[in-house]
């Protein structure tokens, strides 16, 4: 018996030591893998700035690349923050070492407004007198939109490619029929005839108002893109739409015939063409640097500057609590409070890329931003893909609001949802519930019965008060009357271009424009390089991303047509019963 105990203890000790050793080895491997991309890139004395959109992804903040991606067979994709990308392209315009930009736009990923900001930077580069050359093989809406800014667009001569340059489409999902089959009844309480968040759970098709705003939104976004494309290619918007509507852009020869590309080339012919532009005898003699590397070299972090512009990134759903992956009310309020107490911060840029969420969390964030403004520090808003509902709530009081033309904003309205799952339990699962309450309405949020009239009126009153608060704060922030705000509110989603016309924003501009404006508003500052750009919250490190990933597995529906359905169910289940939300009804993905 003693020998058995000794052997057991020895085995346990061995396993413990092995586990500790394995942990240290694993941490060492992670550190080594993370350091692979940490070496400082080198800019050739004279070279080409290469932009391969399939090898990078536009993000709000520059993050570390996932070092484990290559282990799964995937290619390493570099996340590049949109401000970092814009800053790099602007630097290249005046850098004598950069001769021209060579861009491969196929595989472009990023939000719709991020892509607009990126193209705007490319347009400024071209206006500086330097050339942009693009080569496309499988044009999509996003890739051709980017390519169209180029001086020369070359396209593969292979006629077997696939064109997906066919305009924008939005698909709205409705779950009422399946919820009926499951025995689930969702009660939606809202204010705003356009506030369609929650409609997917109570209808099997779009309401008239929802369809109206969706059509207006898609057409406004496409109109912005089509005008830019048409202007760059010196054709009319009408002719461009005619080509697309008549499916006249199928093969590379079609693009050439219609004047949308300049020449069809094989890869070998492309290499020869690049040699001519670069003035090189062989393709191998062309020196190039990738945009993510160049962005790292041209980072504008001036640690010696005594004055700071704090850039606060509010990206994701606005939620209660302090979780890291969303715009958590308590966490962001604490971050903004620290910024407020930093006497070296002389201006703040609030970068909003959020469809909204919790009203309580939104108000906490707004309150802290108001305290910064009360200190005499200007707060400038910059809108990304979304600045809607709660995203607009937190920024309506900012001293100046920049938006992209394709940003989705507004959605000034509120709603609450309470599902009743008693039918599922009793009729489908044969589970019976007997409530025991201390008071008459104690179980009204329990989801085990429908609300009665008194409870519905109670919830509606709460929604009405919050809607009135929302419109009042917008009126105060934008210098409008409450009735004027109510007329353009009602939960209606507007594009940035539309929002400018109705007074919800001040100017069409990028995050770079917002940061420049904030910097120049500081006494004694005449150039952005004179201030330190401090970003909040700090991006997650590789180790932190690894720890986060342990609790967040990839969706089994990722990449499939069911992914949007899964998101819809998650949107419902993540909304706490009875809480009031200021959230946009949908999110848009452009390909």
Residue ranges and their predicted role:
Residues 231-232, 262-306, 415, 471-477, ...:
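C-terminal long alpha-helix characteristic of the crotonase
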Residues 304-344, 462, 536-591:
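Intrinsic disorder and flexible/low-complexity segments
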Residues 40-42, 49-175, 301-424:
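Cleft-lining beta-strand/loop regions that shape enzyme active-site pockets
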Residues 176-273, 422-502, 506-522, 526-528:
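Charged, glycine-interspersed solvent-exposed loop segments at helix/strand-loop junctions
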Residues 5-8, 12, 214, 332, ...:
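Hydrophobic alpha-helical elements at and bordering transmembrane segments
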Residues 2-42, 46:
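N-terminal type II signal-anchor transmembrane helix
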Residues 313-316, 352-354, 381-385, 405-407, ...:
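Active-site proximal loops enriched in glycine and acidic residues that flank catalytic Cys/His/Asp
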Residues 359-364, 498-501, 545-549:
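Short glycine/threonine-rich loop-to-helix capping motif typified by GTGT followed
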């Amino acid at each position: 018996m003693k020998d058995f105990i000794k052997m057991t203890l020895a085995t346990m000790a061995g396993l413990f030591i092995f586990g500790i050793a394995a942990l240290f080895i694993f941490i060492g491997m992670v550190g080594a893998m993370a350091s692979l991309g940490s070496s400082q890139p080198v800019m050739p004395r004279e070279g080409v700035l290469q932009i391969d959109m399939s090898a990078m992804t536009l993000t709000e903040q520059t993050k570390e690349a996932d070092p484990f991606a290559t282990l799964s067979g995937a290619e390493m994709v570099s996340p590049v923050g949109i401000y970092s990308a814009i800053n790099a392209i602007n630097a290249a315009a005046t850098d004598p070492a950069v001769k021209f930009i060579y861009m491969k736009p196929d595989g472009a990923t990023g939000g719709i407004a991020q892509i607009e900001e990126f193209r705007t930077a490319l347009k400024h580069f071209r206006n500086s007198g330097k050339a942009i050359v693009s080569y496309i093989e499988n044009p999509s809406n996003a890739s051709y939109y980017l390519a169209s800014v180029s001086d020369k667009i070359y396209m593969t001569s292979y006629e077997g490619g696939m064109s997906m340059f066919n305009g924008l489409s939005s698909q709205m999902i409705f779950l009422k029929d399946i919820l009926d089959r499951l025995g689930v009844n969702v009660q939606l309480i809202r204010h705003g005839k356009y506030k369609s968040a929650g409609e997917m759970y109570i209808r099997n098709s779009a309401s008239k108002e929802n369809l109206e705003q969706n059509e207006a939104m898609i057409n406004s976004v496409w109109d912005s893109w089509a005008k830019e494309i048409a202007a760059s290619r010196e054709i009319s918007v009408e002719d461009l739409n005619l080509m697309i509507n008549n499916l006249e852009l199928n093969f590379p020869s079609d693009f050439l015939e219609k004047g949308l590309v300049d020449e069809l080339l094989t890869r070998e012919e492309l290499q020869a063409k690049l040699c001519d532009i670069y003035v090189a005898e062989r393709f191998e003699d062309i020196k190039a640097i990738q945009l993510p590397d160049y962005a790292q070299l041209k980072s504008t972090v001036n640690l010696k500057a005594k004055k700071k512009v704090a850039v606060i990134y509010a990206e994701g759903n606005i939620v209660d609590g302090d979780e890291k992956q969303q715009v958590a009310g308590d966490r962001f309020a604490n971050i903004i409070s620290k910024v407020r107490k930093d006497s070296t911060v002389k201006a703040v840029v609030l970068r909003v890329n959020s469809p909204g969420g919790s009203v309580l969390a939104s108000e906490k964030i707004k309150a802290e931003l108001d305290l910064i403004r009360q200190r005499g520090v200007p707060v400038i808003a910059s809108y990304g893909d979304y600045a809607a509902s709660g995203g607009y709530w937190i920024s309506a009081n900012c001293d100046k609001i920049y938006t992209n033309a394709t940003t989705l904003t507004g959605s000034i309205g509120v709603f609450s949802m309470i599902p009743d799952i008693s039918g599922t339990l009793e009729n489908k699962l044969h589970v019976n519930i007997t409530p025991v309450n201390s008071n008459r309405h104690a179980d009204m949020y329990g989801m085990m019965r429908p609300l009665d009239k008194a409870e519905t009126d109670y919830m509606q009153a709460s929604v009405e008060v919050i809607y009135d608060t929302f419109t009042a704060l917008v009126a105060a922030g934008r210098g409008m009357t409450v009735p004027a705000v109510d007329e353009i509110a009602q939960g209606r989603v507007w594009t940035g271009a539309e929002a400018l016309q109705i007074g919800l924003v001040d100017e069409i501009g990028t995050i770079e424009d917002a940061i420049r404006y904030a910097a120049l508003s500081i006494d004694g500052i005449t150039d952005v390089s004179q201030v330190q750009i401090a970003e909040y919250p700090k991006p997650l490190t590789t180790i932190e991303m690894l720890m986060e990933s342990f609790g967040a597995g990839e969706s089994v529906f990722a990449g499939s047509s069911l992914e949007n359905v899964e998101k819809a169910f998650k949107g419902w289940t993540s909304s706490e019963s009875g809480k009031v939300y200021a959230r946009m009804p949908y999110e848009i993905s452009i390909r």
